[in-house]
Amino acid sequence: MSHEWLISASETMRSIGNGEGLRDKGAVVANNDGEFNEGDTNREEDSSTIFSFDFDEEIVMCIDFSGGKLGCSILDYHTKTLKAFDQDYVVNKTTISSHDLIDDADMSSNDISLLLGLLIMEANPTVCLVPARLEDWIFDYIKTKCDEINCRLELQPIKRFKKWDLLQSLQLRGHDNQTILNDILSNSKFTTTVTLGTVGCILANHEQLGEYNDSTASSNMVTGRLVQNAFEDVIHGIRYIDIRDRMVLDENTISALHIFPTAHKLGHDKMMRNGFFSVFELFNQVSSDYARRILKSWLINPLTNKKRIETRYSIIRTLLDKQNAIIFSDLSQSIKRCPDAFGFINQLRSGKSTLGTWSKVASFLEKGIAIFQLVSSLKLGSDEANILHDIKNKVDISALKECLRKVETVIDFDTSRDTKTLTINTGVDNRLDECRNIYNHLEGILLDVARETQIFLLNTMPQEDCKTTKSLEKLVNAVYIPQLGYLVTISVLMEPLLDGIPNLQWEEIFRSSENIYFKNGRVLELDETYGDIYGAISDFEIEILFSLQEQILRRKTQLTAYNILLSELEILLSFAQVSAERNYAEPQLVEDECILEIINGRHALYETFLDNYIPNSTMIDGGLFSELSWCEQNKGRIIVVTGANASGKSVYLTQNGLIVYLAQIGCFVPAERARIGIADKILTRIRTQETVYKTQSSFLLDSQQMAKSLSLATEKSLILIDEYGKGTDILDGPSLFGSIMLNMSKSEKCPRIIACTHFHELFNENVLTENIKGIKHYCTDILISQKYNLLETAHVGEDHESEGITFLFKVKEGISKQSFGIYCAKVCGLSRDIVERAEELSRMINRGDDVVQQCGNLTEKEMREFQKNQEIVKKFLSWDLDLETTTTSENLRLKLKNFLR
């Protein structure tokens, strides 16, 4: 007998955590996605604009600048963390720079722009809130930065920045959280006035979103809680935004040092596959999005606190210890693809959990336990506490094991993966097991009902109707439909025959194009006996999962804290892995010395593209930072590098910058040895930031970068300058460069400077000579063959293009007064005629000839050509065209050809 199963056993063992499946069955699932009216990114509000807002993923940033004070706070909905300045950032012009090269008006704007750019880049907000009274130049800068990262900029009324009472009503768990909150509130009238206003604005903004979300009747099916104004649901912790112990990098430096990727790998050769275009790519061996966010934060914010930096060194040193080699390898494997605890906890809280969610919970717990055991096996030093000590001593491993035991006891992951639905283990709940047993035997029960119905119809229908009726097995069935219960189905072909049955007492429920669905006495008995078995199973499973979910959420603070530790450990494992693979060395940091000593340093990125990279050393010893008379003590803080084109000057420049940078993010460095005075800023004039929307000339953009670097630099800074002065007059460019070098060499608070230049005229007597105090001269070494004349630019034969000069890519002390630009142009394929003419002009200049006069003299070849052309002109002028009126055009053409012979 055939049965029409609308809901079969395989189809109904569904994932009750899946919202769509439950909606299909008539359940109501909370949808926390809301929409709200906010203004666009113009200075005028547009209340008709509607944006969606994800309460689990948004990052809201609020910035205010008032009375010379900058305040900032950030609410991360993903991690449920509120971050704020521990005190307002005060713009103090007297401490910005000791140099008199920049107007005071530009100092504060550069300082604020630099800080705002770093904050926005690090936070990567999705929404940025600013007050309507914000100064135009700050608003324009923030808008530009927000546009770059596709962040929505929203103007807020001033009254929202006075909602301090919202922060006072905030209740946070944990001693640290409450301490920070009380500290911010207690200093609200003194040091955190502007920052506290930004926090109030963020809370007021969330309050408005909650009210809108509540008005749309969005609810949470599992937790039964409305979003409303419950800040405790979105803020689980509060942290300081620390801007004091960080090295400052501006966007020019980040671009020049290739901190983040700006290009994609092209090609399939081994060199391209193994090479890295950015520091982020070099260390991006992490698997979770949250770990990637922390890595980005670390890269944007190198440290200046020696103790914190050396704590990271100690972890790398421990991981690379030969005694820990096997454990290090196992740790690197175990931590891969470790799920993000913030993600699955948000899904559990919002009622959006699926099989994937619970799989991540189990995977996180399994990997977390395995990593704890591996870390506990490491041979740790007795130095101060670090992440490894925190994992070993502060993580409650018994709680993790208990959570894992409960999850594995409740959920049958093997069956769930096979059926692609969430399945509860047998034995968890006797009531659920009993309902499942009934459900699994429904096919037999319904088969019996269908047979009984067929027999009933055969016995009650008139004899003549029975003869005309086809096989009842194909026309009569029994089915179960959730919520409707048990039904008898009859083919619509049999409807006329049913009219002949007296006192049938069947109730039609609904019909389709092929069947009619009835309730009769037999199926009513099933309704009474078994009820809505599918709904009962769903209810029991929801109840079980809700109980499990609550048990996991009670541990959310411990799980998220451990998640942060694991993410930071994964980054340090990446640092250690790169350091081991590429033979990096642990640098020595000093706090009070203006020193940059690098022995056999290498470029962290360029060496990934080369089989053999040629190392170079650097030595800057500028005495103590506090020494105002450093230049009188035979110390040097400035290096000027000269040399041939394409000889490696720019690479050497960025190589030193990257080594200092890597040292202060807490990683080992690509060098044999390094001793580095901690830098508070790395500032650059290397790459001209030209874009379509910037209409300034390249020299103007270069000068803006140079001015910004000089205005922000302190005695602890590092400035990298690559060929400043090009792109303008041949006198103005060298004059500006030389003036900057001389002025800085006399400054009491001169930063460390490494500069490259091709202005060889500066190294003549009484300008940038080797005798000037405070300046050291380096040059790139080259090997010149005997065929190459140092006094005259040699001609490179067509068959010997690669002969003459060999670039050694080695830096040594001294001054190079030749750039060999013509040779480089020849090797690069520039036209031979152009190169030969350039060589000729170069020889004239080197001999001291008058180039203008020489260019006015004609060669013998040119004189012969001139005389020939002169004869042609004379012949043409003596030609009497009046005599040619009857000459055909063809004959005229022939005569003209004769003139030109």
Swiss-Prot record:
Domain of life the protein comes from: Eukaryota
InterPro entries (alphabetical): DNA_mismatch_repair_Msh2, DNA_mismatch_repair_MutS_C, DNA_mismatch_repair_MutS_core, DNA_mismatch_repair_MutS_sf, MutS, P-loop_NTPase
Keywords: ATP-binding, DNA damage, DNA repair, DNA-binding, Nucleotide-binding
Covalent S-S links between cysteines: none
GO cellular component, one term: nuclear chromosome
Binding site for ATP: G643, A644, N645, A646, S647, G648, K649, S650
GO molecular function: ATP binding; ATP-dependent DNA damage sensor activity; mismatched DNA binding
GO biological process: one example: reciprocal meiotic recombination
Main function: Involved in meiotic recombination. Facilitate crossovers between homologs during meiosis.
Annotated family: Belongs to the DNA mismatch repair MutS family.
Subunit structure and binding partners: Heterooligomer of MSH4 and MSH5.
Note: Two distinct classes of crossovers have been demonstrated in budding yeast. Class I is MSH4/MSH5 dependent and exhibits crossover interference. Class II is MUS81/MMS4 dependent and exhibits no interference.
Record's protein name: MutS protein homolog 5
Organism name: Saccharomyces cerevisiae (strain ATCC 204508 / S288c) (Baker's yeast)
